[in-house]
Amino acid sequence: MKTFCGRANPTTGSLEWVEEDEDYDYHQEIARSRYADMLHDKDRNMKYYQGIRAAVSRVKGRGEKAIVLDIGTGTGLLSMMAASAGADFCYAVEVFKPMANAAVKIVEKNGFGDKIKVINKHSTEVTVGPDGDMQCRANILVTELFDTELIGEGALPTYEHAHKYLVQEGCEAVPHRATVYVQLVESKRMWSWNKLFPVHVEAEDGEKIIVSPSEMENCPGVPSVCDIQLNQMPSSDFTILSDVVTMFSVDFSKPVRSASTCYRAQLDPVKSGKAQIVLSWWDIDMDPSGTINCTMAPYWVKPMSAFQWRDHWMQCVYFLPKEEQVLQGEKVHLTACRDEYSVWYTLQKAREEDESKADARVESPVCRCQAHLLWNRPRFGELNDQNRTRQYIKSLMSVLRTDSVCLCISDGSLLPVLAHYLGAEQVFTLENSAVSCSVMKKFFKANHLEDKIKIVEARPELLTSSHLEEKKISVLVGEPFFTTSLLPWHNLYFWYARTAVTEHLASDVTVLPQSAALHMMIVEFQDLWRIRSPCGTCEGFDVQTMDDMIKNSLNFRESKEAEPHPLWEYPCKSLSNPQEVLLFDFRKTVPQHCLSTEGSVNLLRKGKSHGAVLWMEYHLTADISVSTGLMQISNEKGNCEWNPHCKQAVYFFSSVIESETLADVPTAVTYAIKFDTKTGEIAMDFKLL
């Protein structure tokens, strides 16, 4: 059965009704899941297996039957580990129906159908008793309910319920405990993801400084965790201010409380500096003695020889509400507060008067300035990138005249301020969301520009002459940046907006950027390929059914599409030269016909061709460009440096998805890329030769 779904098209800006198969949602969920990544996590799987064997052995050693409850079973892997370790019976709970169906097949295929019962329910709905889902309470609790923040997927309320209703008192738990660690650092780079720094503009009448509204300066930001591959953050980008300390632990073998609470740790700064960031990660002990340990610690804490790449568990960056000066040897107190699903931090000087406040509840951070709702963290980083801003200043200086009437089309951009300071006679900015309007009003007011720059709250196609005070636009500018964009080419919405406002443009209008180009390069990933690679067997268990399910869902939609990834976090090396494949001329309106290209790229280096990376370059003027992708190939090995503020598009080749073993190493890759100007979508196909 087909169903119609209303979707906003990020490239054309129009609302479209799309016919989708009724199974579309779950296919997309499977295709975009990290199941494969978890199955490839050898360290995790091995430690879980060791912990489960030890738990079953302890229960059997007491002369008891080993009854296992596995919550969030996924493929059934942990239940099969328990059954093969000698458990008498396992209850495997999985709420996602397609996954539960796959688990039933996998369990049967591996010969554990008589030892494992898959229950397709949320664990809080599972019943115990002669007529229940479980005959009796379990004495071994096995789960993998953790995310990068540990508790973000609801581990605490799930454990709390399980201890009350599903497991015996004094049960064994795998993992046995989790411990959260923190470290205080100063980092201009990471702080730039949460605060807007002053922007210096050299204008003809002297230096101007663009400042943030005080409301934004004092705003703690949004409560959502910033999870990144901290192992890709060079040590030169942060200064360690404290040793690593334990913030809190959770013992999963005892009743767990999910109610909000706070923890406090004393830190002795090892260096003076600005405390801005709390870096955090966790580890899990699979057994009570802590000998079987799985850790997320970053490279400067544990030796790289013990490093296991994983994408389903990373490390956390927390922004303190405001930066605090700390002095070496002068103690400070770090407070971690948590609710059921998230954690946040505050820092206090360790003075006596603060002791009485130790138990005071600290409210979860809430963005009141709205800028953190408009701009995500990479966008803050982009706006703070002085080199990038200089390119826009340089290009604006070359096109603006004293009589220029300027219109800016981008979401929450600083370009209108730059255009005004650089001499435009009049500046209009098109903001088509209430949030961006509100933020920009505050911004202009803080810089005494509320009477100098006019905000037009309208969609481009609804722009009227009266909005523009009956003036024609001589300079149309955009970064372009739009909050709805996920893939690099979605910002081509600027082209569609430019087309929609054509009647308001002067005949000799200057458009900046004047054009954009789609670029492409073939790469070998160090690790990212694993998220799309089949597993086959995992710790000796056949999970081919899972591979087939993911492949089927990828074929349903995703495998012929590129997906966004921030490649500064995922190292790769180039196997081909970067190549421009499509050009979009913003000086002209969007054409009626499709834009398409075919060709081939030669592979210059040996390596596994995992996929193609695609990105946009914007030609601001004839000789000034900004890239959203490749910044440079840093050495002869082909290691790449990527724009850290943007996600690049990755198209994985079928050789990754289907785990093909190529008899001959390919020497070239052919491509066919088509941009449908009506839908704004890019279709692509690649073949290895």
Curated annotation (Swiss-Prot):
Keyword Nucleus: yes
Organism of origin: Gallus gallus (Chicken)
Entry's EC annotation: 2.1.1.321
Classification via SUPFAM superfamilies: S-adenosyl-L-methionine-dependent methyltransferases (SSF53335)
Catalytic activity, as annotated: L-arginyl-[protein] + S-adenosyl-L-methionine = N(omega)-methyl-L-arginyl-[protein] + S-adenosyl-L-homocysteine + H(+)
Biological-process GO terms, alphabetical: chromatin remodeling; genomic imprinting; methylation; regulation of DNA-templated transcription; spliceosomal snRNP assembly
Domain SAM-dependent MTase PRMT-type: 14-344, 359-685
Superkingdom of the source species: Eukaryota
Gene that produces this protein: PRMT7
EC top class, as a word: transferase
Active site location: 144, 153
Taxonomy of the source species: Eukaryota, Metazoa, Chordata, Craniata, Vertebrata
Localization of this protein: Cytoplasm, Cytosol; Nucleus
Identification of the protein by name: Protein arginine N-methyltransferase 7
Function: Arginine methyltransferase that can both catalyze the formation of omega-N monomethylarginine (MMA) and symmetrical dimethylarginine (sDMA), with a preference for the formation of MMA. Specifically mediates the symmetrical dimethylation of arginine residues in the small nuclear ribonucleoproteins Sm D1 (SNRPD1) and Sm D3 (SNRPD3); such methylation being required for the assembly and biogenesis of snRNP core particles. Specifically mediates the symmetric dimethylation of histone H4 'Arg-3' to form H4R3me2s.
Keywords per UniProt: Chromatin regulator, Cytoplasm, Differentiation, Methyltransferase, Nucleus, Repeat, S-adenosyl-L-methionine, Transcription, Transcription regulation, Transferase
A GO CC term attached to the entry: nucleus
Molecular function as annotated in GO: histone H4 methyltransferase activity; histone H4R3 methyltransferase activity; histone methyltransferase activity; protein-arginine N-methyltransferase activity; protein-arginine omega-N monomethyltransferase activity; protein-arginine omega-N symmetric methyltransferase activity; S-adenosylmethionine-dependent methyltransferase activity
InterPro entries per record: Arg_MeTrfase, MeTrfase_PRMT7, PRMT_dom, SAM-dependent_MTases_sf
Family as reported in the entry's similarity comment: Belongs to the class I-like SAM-binding methyltransferase superfamily. Protein arginine N-methyltransferase family. PRMT7 subfamily.
